[in-house]
Amino acid sequence: MPKPEKVQKVEELYQKMLNANALIFTEFKGLSVADLTQLRGKIRPLNAEYRVVKNTLALLAIRKIYPDKDLEKFFVGPTAITYCYGDPFGVLKALVDYAKEHELLKFKGGIIEGEVYSADEVKELAKLPPKEVLLSQVVGAISAPLSSLVWSLKWPVNKLVWTLDAIAKEKEKISINQ
């Protein structure tokens, strides 16, 4: 029979995991409390939190959400989970930047919007620009050909108007001179 405190802790972890749109698993062995506090301070403004978890309890919680995914590999050794409630790519970038400064922080992998990623894939995803930048690039890519098309269709009409305007001005000059 599980202890009530552990049941409650599993439920808390489950709720955090359920509310997050991304979970990033890291190993923090060797990092000081000050280092972890600094890391938490960097990701807090990005709508994320970094928590050290007990592997068995976290695994019980995550199996409720992803029962068919092989996630045991993320819960070996000291584990911390970054819960991302906003844009996960900004948080990933902050974590990767922090890991460059603090080599003891190791990525284990992650789950982003329901997809499981390895440690290397998580690091690659961190290289992507933020969602807003990607969206603006897509809009730009879509609108550029349309703008060219509009200009191409408008050009002959503009040329005709300019020609007619030039003819009208020329006739006006001739009528003034007579």
Curated annotation (Swiss-Prot):
Gene3D superfamilies: 3.30.70.1730, 6.10.250.290. GO terms for molecular function: large ribosomal subunit rRNA binding. GO terms for biological process: translation. It comes from the Bacteria. Keywords: Ribonucleoprotein, Ribosomal protein, RNA-binding, rRNA-binding. InterPro entries: Ribosomal_uL10, Ribosomal_uL10-like_sf, Ribosomal_uL10_bac, Ribosomal_uL10_bac_type. GO terms for cellular component: ribonucleoprotein complex; ribosome. Signal peptide: none annotated. Belongs to the universal ribosomal protein uL10 family. Forms part of the ribosomal stalk, playing a central role in the interaction of the ribosome with GTP-bound translation factors. Part of the ribosomal stalk of the 50S ribosomal subunit. The N-terminus interacts with L11 and the large rRNA to form the base of the stalk. The C-terminus forms an elongated spine to which L12 dimers bind in a sequential fashion forming a multimeric L10(L12)X complex. This is Large ribosomal subunit protein uL10. It comes from Dictyoglomus thermophilum (strain ATCC 35947 / DSM 3960 / H-6-12). The lineage of its organism: Bacteria, Pseudomonadati, Dictyoglomota, Dictyoglomia, Dictyoglomales.
